[in-house]
Amino acid sequence: MDGILKAVREKIEIEKQLQHQLETCSADICAAMFEEFAPFPHNSNGQLCWPAHWDADVGDLRKHLLRFFEYDDCFSGCRAQRMWPLYLEAAFPFMRGMPLIDMLTSLVVRTWHHRSCGKAWLQSVEFFCGKANLSLAALEAGLKAAAMDKTLNPEHNVLEAPGLRLALLLLTATVPGALEWLGSPCNSYVVLCRAQSLRSADNMYLGDESKYFVLEGNCLGDISALLVLLGVMTLLRF
């Protein structure tokens, strides 16, 4: 076979293999596949626990969370503090009634726990991935990747409890320094949509929430911010 044709055929075969890998780590995944990352480290009384030598790190984490709450108070009308508990209670019903700072602490400590015992393995996670081109590039680079988008699988819809649970499980399965990428839908935020969304500084750009697409955009923004904050907080250790 001619040299160039052979090279092309090999390239096509490699692309087929990568595409299969991509489907396996994107469209085919669901929350049930990551349940090994669901448990939270707890003691015999069911209380969240961690090694004594983590005490300073957990204290530092909670200080950072309190500073974030101050920012939320000043610039977002306490949006995160009002909305995030609703989302987290949907994903983890046992959290119902917990203070938000304890919910967030639990999620971060759980990630630290899985990293410390060697269970974490994801090096790249792409949320709202669309066609997952970034994850395809990650696989091509030899990284262990996962991607989710409701266009690939209805179970990836983060506005439903299983989808949000999956997103948080994926975050928990990441190694230190993993890439966390969000392609959050922004159609209701663009200038061309302003006449319909009615987003402005006067309403903190929340717009007319009586319209479904605006409310959906706001909720997706809330969840995106939650994932970003958790991703940053997990870097306080390791």
Regions found by a protein language model. Give the residues of each.
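Conserved active-site and SAM-binding loop architecture
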Residues: 8, 12-238
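Short Cys/His-based metal-binding microdomains
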Residues: 1, 6
